Amino acid sequence: MRVIKRNGKFEDVSFDKVIRRIRNIAANCGGLNGVELDEIAQKICSHIFDGVKTSELDELTGRLAASMITHHPDYGVLASRIVISNHQKNTLNTFSDKMMLLYHNTECLSNEFYTNLKKYKNQIDKHIDYDRDFSYDYFAFKTLEKAYLLKIKSKIIERPQDMLMRVSLFLHGNTGIDKVLQCYNFLSNKYFIHATPTLFHAGSPKSQLLSCFLIGTEDSIKGIYKTITDCAQISKWAGGIGVHVSNIRASNSLIRGTNGRSDGIIPMLKVYNSTALFVNQSGKRAGSFAIYLETWHADIFEFLDLKKTHGDMEKRALDLFYAMWISDLFMERVEKDEMWSLFSPDEAKGLTDVYGDEFEELYV
């Protein structure tokens, strides 16, 4: 039985070679006394076929070790060490080489970033510490691998430390190398971490770095669809969105322009639900929309049912997140078991614009 090494050459493989490699990795991790190394090696050998690549064997070993984490935490340490070591062998050795490869083969790095890269590449290549990659556990690394590390087509180019240095160079490249390296050290030593959009887009020509956006909705067809379009654009660049819909007229309210009746907020929210699914965050994770409604809105009961997995599914929107804006007056009425009245915002004008004493005066 032969395997294909990374240089393309064939090499005979045996149980002894497999167990030796796993023992060497375990030794580099301090021994891993909780791991049955022979058992792992036997499982690997049962999956070997003629012509399998050594990088594929490493991935398989990592998955098998990760599947046994419930037996002992040391299996997780072994799994992360194997897959990260494998990833480092499959990528270029210097930060500058990787960034230049990305710049010349994709559109994910800006000209300004590339200029700063050329200016500081020697200092950065000398400073970056790839051993810090091994501080990530298996599942953390797999998350980075799936969504955060930059690729050329489907081939991952970055290592975790490259991602952190890319962020640092983008944010501080114009203020000098000292700030770049300081930021990198803080990030790589896990003193703090930037938000996901920053990790996704730092260095790109369209560097949308913000996590959260809050949007209101106008009570008209034009206003509703403008807000949906804005949400789609924000989600495209990995932003999470909070939308307040309390000023949208309730079900069965009069539409004066057509003399018809409104269907309320539920059909509209189903469009938001579809938008969140269709326009995911930079193609890397699902869109995230949170919908806010005040407790006096006449559609509040239907709103509270939107997340239920039973009942009339035409009145459900399962992929959105929901929250109520609750006033002090509402909680006072709850405590006293008093009447609470519901309104459509086109009839109770101004309630969405006030709070505190002003809200209580207008509501009462």
Feature locations, PLM:
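Extended catalytic cores of very large enzyme megasubunits
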Residues: 1-364
